[in-house]
């Protein structure tokens, strides 16, 4: 590889430098997926004579948590200094990832048997949730980073 194409010889330091921006750019993926899964839940809420009212998922709590996380994200962006908010960004992406997995699961169950077909929007969203959980830094990496920064 030509020397002119080498960004750095210290990959660990480079990763630490770009990490806040890298995480911040990924968060809207999770927020958008949560929003569209919540919309799917709403769209299917009254199917089959309202049977979904008996599901024990707290959809209103999901919506409230989504709004809180979204507000936290935009407050960080408004501050303009992502580097000073690394801990918050790590926690935020992790919280969004776990909420996304929960909401997507609820969306599939809420959608009934048609939600289990390979090309249903619920299954697509479920795959998006798994992708977000596995997107570097993964939920595992975020937990490790949190532990390292705390201690």
Task: Pin down the residues of each PLM region.
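C-terminal helix-coil-helix/basic helical segment that borders enzyme active sites and/or dimer interfaces
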Residues: 46, 66-98, 105-117
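Residue-level signal for pocket-adjacent positions within structured domains
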Residues: 9, 13, 111, 121
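Generic structural signal for well-ordered, non-transmembrane alpha-helical segments
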Residues: 32, 60-67, 90, 94-101, ...
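Extended hydrophobic/Leu-rich segments
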Residues: 11, 51, 82, 148-149
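Short, charged, amphipathic alpha-helical segments
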Residues: 53-60, 86-91, 120
């Amino acid at each position: 590889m030509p020397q002119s194409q080498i960004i750095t010889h210290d990959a660990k330091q480079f990763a630490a430098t770009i990490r806040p921006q890298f995480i911040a750019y990924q968060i809207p993926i999770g927020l958008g997926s949560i929003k569209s899964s919540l919309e799917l839940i709403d769209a299917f809420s009254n199917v089959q004579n309202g049977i979904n009212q008996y599901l024990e998922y707290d959809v209103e709590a999901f919506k409230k948590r989504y709004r809180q996380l979204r507000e936290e994200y935009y407050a960080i962006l408004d501050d303009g200094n992502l580097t000073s908010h690394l801990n918050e960004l790590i926690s935020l992406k992790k919280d969004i990832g776990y909420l996304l997995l929960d909401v997507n699961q609820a969306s599939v169950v809420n959608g009934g048997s048609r939600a289990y077909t390979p090309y249903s929007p619920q299954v697509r969203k479920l795959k998006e949730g798994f992708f977000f959980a596995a997107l570097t830094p993964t939920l595992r990496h975020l937990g490790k980073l949190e532990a390292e920064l705390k201690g």
